[in-house]
Regions:
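Conserved active-site segments centered on acidic
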Residues: 2-89, 158-169, 174
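Helix N-cap/beta->alpha junction signal
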Residues: 23, 97-98
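Phosphate-binding/catalytic loops
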Residues: 92, 98-174
Length: 174
């Protein structure tokens, strides 16, 4: 668990290549699911990319549109690059594919390797190991990525709900 201000939260960081498609969609989906479950205050959620070519830019237009059609607002997010400090700060650093996981192992302190996981590991029913990059593809590619992302975020939230509920019980009333 990570200390953010006065509260302890569960830190989740979603990782893709440029932080303009998959990882911001995952951030938006998870935030929305946690909010609907009444657990948002238990989480610190962010996303980043392994590549720095789009830093400061908003998500891809089709990523914004696909997410919005399912009720997830990601329009205000901006791309950033992951750094070693992120791996220290976040409890779960979730890679959208095996290449990202390998990249993260180059920058992560060895003692924190257990924080690095494939995102799809949270959806045991998924046949996908990687969330395919929809960038440059048609809307259907973004929808397919979102199907995997929503299922993975649902599994992640279910896995972390007992811990999140415990954290919320321990936090002082506002």
């Amino acid at each position: 668990m990570t200390a953010w201000g006065w509260a302890m939260t569960i830190g989740i960081l979603f990782i893709c290549t440029s932080n303009i498609c998959r990882s911001p969609m995952a951030e938006g989906v998870f935030r929305n699911m946690a909010r609907r479950a009444g657990l948002a205050a238990a989480f610190t959620v962010d996303s980043a990319g392994t590549f720095d070519g789009y830093v400061g830019r908003p998500p891809a237009p089709l990523a914004i549109k696909a997410a919005a059609l399912r009720g997830h607002d990601i329009a205000g997010l901006r791309a950033r690059q992951v750094g070693e400090g992120d791996i220290v700060r976040f409890d779960y650093v979730l890679a959208m594919d095996r290449c990202h996981l390998a990249d993260l192992r180059w920058i992560a302190p060895r003692a924190l390797f257990e924080r690095l996981q494939l995102f799809t590991s949270f959806d045991p029913s998924s046949r996908a190991v990687d969330v395919a990059d929809p960038y440059g593809g048609p809307m259907g590619d973004y929808e397919q990525a979102l199907d995997i992302i929503e299922a993975g975020c649902d599994g992640l939230l279910k896995a972390l709900t007992p811990l999140a509920e415990g954290l919320l019980r321990e936090q002082p009333a506002a």
